[in-house]
Amino acid sequence: KVNAPELLRREIPKKKKRGAVWVSGVCDPYQPLEAKYRLTRQCLEILAQNNWPAIIQTRSPLVLRDIDIIRDARDFEAGLSVTTADDEIRKLFEPHAPPIEQRIQALDELHRAGIRTYAMVAPMLPGAEGLAELLRGKIDSIIIDRMNYHYADWVYRKYGLEDSLADDFFYRTRQALASL
């Protein structure tokens, strides 16, 4: 992947139809090594220089390092995955991800910089109902999805969280978050 900026620079002129580039819906673009290699930053610079729309999704407050590019680009938006308001729950399901408070703070800083922001509450974890108050005024939109990974059901059972797998939990929490 170290040649990603070079490939992007070469491929963009070949594209006749513009579509938003999702950076990155599958693999976090701000993993710890990004601090050293700066590949995401280079790719964002290339996209911005070519007026190419981009949607950035991460769990990492490292996205703030690139706030200048994101803010000044013509059509960029940035979002953070925030699956619960409860950091103890985060530790069970996302033990290596940044704390919830840091992600909320990053959303706030991005939003105050005039950047379109969103929260990705997917998968919705126990404690997500507390996100409404934490996210209010910090996002322009929200994406919500339930826990669809049945291989994770054992974690719910082990810690007595089965109620959060129920349809009622999803619909009740979705309604609370929809008010944003």
Residue ranges and their predicted role:
Residues 46-52, 105-117, 171-180:
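A structural motif corresponding to the C-terminal end of an alpha-helix
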Residues 125-180:
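Auxiliary Fe-S-binding modules of radical SAM enzymes
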